[in-house]
Amino acid sequence: MLRVMMLGLRGFPGVGVEAHAEHLCELLRELDCDVEVVVRSAYVPGDRGNDWKGVHYLRIWSPGSRALETIVHSFLGVLAAAWRRPDVLHVQAIGPALMVPLARALGLRVVVTHHGADYEREKWGRFAKAMLRIGEAWGMRFCNRRIVISRTIRNLVRNKYGLESNVIPNGVDLPELPTSTSALERFGLTPGRYVLTVSRMVPEKRHKDLLAAYATAKLNGWKLVLIGAIDRPDAYTSEVVALARATPGAVLAGFQTGLSLRELYAHAGLFVLPSSHEGLPIALLEALSYGLPVLASDIPAHLEIGLDEKHYFALGDVQALATRLELFARMRLSQAQRESTRRWVADRYEWHTVVEQTVRVYRSAMEQSASRRRLLDRFLSPLSW
């Protein structure tokens, strides 16, 4: 059995990196992996238990400061990994990768997944961005094996560091389409008559662009539903909440999971992701897995998914987005068209393929480590002189 420890996560369930790791960990168990996830105790209270779908939790404290949370938690997580000695320490994202040199110095085999250039996110200040750049450099240079979730990130790593990576994208499952509408009734929604976006409430998700475009567009009774957690209230979240409350038809649905989230996806008329920065957006893949028509900003991460040109609009162009909203609101997809979309995304981003490729990277990291150890033993052996 392969023992894997996962580092760099707040906990499950979640969005973004957490959603990626949540699916990955669950399926790793099916390939005979024993998975332990280092989580932040503030996000996973003890009353949730120590296991999640067969995945073990290791709760470790982290400070409340946004600037220090990841660094301190990752440092403590590496020390815990050094004590527990997993076969592979899998570090998720470039922030926690700041601790990769320490992990290697402590004799751990390390795989790093690069989910995107987080130093380009608008929410971070100068110091945090500097730490993220160092985390990227140290993580890529000192790990045993590196995974990137898109060709765009592979090219970034290749051009900046002269290093090759394993491209393993985010995956997506084909969900069963619920017919129930309890969540819609709770928010006063009509099936097929609302625009949906799902993301954390942070500046690079560009909620204000979407709200402005929705207010401009003539959508004849459609509503706009914003799903996503507010990690920490700040000036941006206050602006978005105030703007949403001042926009007739806008609905702040907060964090959703389980059946409620599935219902809100399944019955949406259109999904929109206007982000200025993404790695490979799971929320967009999930929208496609429900067969939804989608609109996305024309950033490289979205373009790489390979949708038809009509599904993209220029980043930050509110009027262009409003025009597309009106156009797509008039479209009606048949059930056959929705099923075609579902099959298309499932063929390209199948989760079991993602997990099998990840396990191969783990075993490659272990073989590399064993090979280096044999070389060192041969060099140090008196018989070799």
Language model features with spans:
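Conserved acidic donor-binding segment of nucleotide-sugar-dependent glycosyltransferases
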Residues: 311-319, 327-332
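Short hydrophobic beta-strand element within catalytic cores of glycosyltransferases
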Residues: 293-296
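Short alpha-helical donor nucleotide-sugar binding micro-motif in glycosyltransferases
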Residues: 255-256, 263-268
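Nucleotide-activated donor-binding/catalytic signature segment of Leloir-type glycosyltransferases, i.e.
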Residues: 237-259
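Conserved donor-binding/catalytic core segment of Leloir-type glycosyltransferases
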Residues: 5, 188-216, 225
